[in-house]
């Protein structure tokens, strides 16, 4: 494979980067989206975070939500979780929510390319997928885990179809 074969894909990925930051320009000024669920998560996870800071260990139970529940559903940090590093690499370390828009674009583009769709049509399809209104609604609501799942779904489908 020579550079002329991958050149259009490199250009399109660079376009995805440009669009991700152009759409979320306030990120470049240090601003962040204040999603409702993210704000409430800060309060829900305070007891767990305080315990982590004071003991250096992870709490496995919290009393600060629903009269008590397992902490792993809220804020346990797993040091052996390598997926977070893979996510950082694939999303190029971009801040949220630009990373999510980039993943939406890249994921659907890769899916369409794996289906042997022309790269120009694949790029248009990626923009159509990424700019679905629901994706931005869940970002504003603070549903970051759901947004990540939706962003990676096309890549999972591409991997299944490719094998």
Predicted features, each with a name:
Residues 1-25:
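Start-transfer (signal-anchor) and selected internal transmembrane alpha helices
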Residues 2, 108-116:
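Membrane-water interface regions at transmembrane-helix termini and the short interhelical loops
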Residues 7-15, 100, 120-125, 149:
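Alpha-helical transmembrane segments of integral membrane proteins
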Residues 9-13, 77, 107, 122, ...:
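Generic structural microfeature
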Residues 20-111, 127-154:
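Membrane-interface coil-to-helix junctions
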Residues 113-121, 163:
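Membrane-helix interface "capping/anchor" motifs
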Residues 156-163:
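Membrane-interface transmembrane helices that cradle and orient dolichyl/undecaprenyl
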């Amino acid at each position: 494979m020579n550079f002329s074969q991958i050149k259009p894909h490199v250009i399109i990925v660079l376009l995805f980067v440009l669009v991700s930051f152009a759409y979320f320009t306030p990120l470049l000024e240090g601003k962040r989206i204040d999603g409702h669920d993210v704000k409430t998560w800060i309060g829900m996870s305070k007891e767990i975070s305080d315990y982590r800071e004071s003991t250096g260990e992870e709490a496995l139970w919290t009393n600060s939500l629903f009269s008590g529940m397992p902490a792993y559903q809220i804020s346990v940090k797993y040091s052996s979780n390598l997926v977070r590093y893979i996510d950082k690499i694939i999303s190029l370390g971009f801040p949220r929510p630009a990373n999510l828009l980039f993943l939406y674009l890249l994921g659907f583009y890769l899916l369409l390319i794996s289906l042997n769709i022309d790269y120009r049509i694949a790029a248009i399809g990626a923009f159509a997928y990424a700019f679905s209104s629901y994706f931005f609604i869940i970002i504003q609501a603070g549903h970051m885990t759901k947004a990540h799942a939706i962003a990676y779904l096309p890549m999972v489908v591409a991997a299944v179809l490719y094998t």
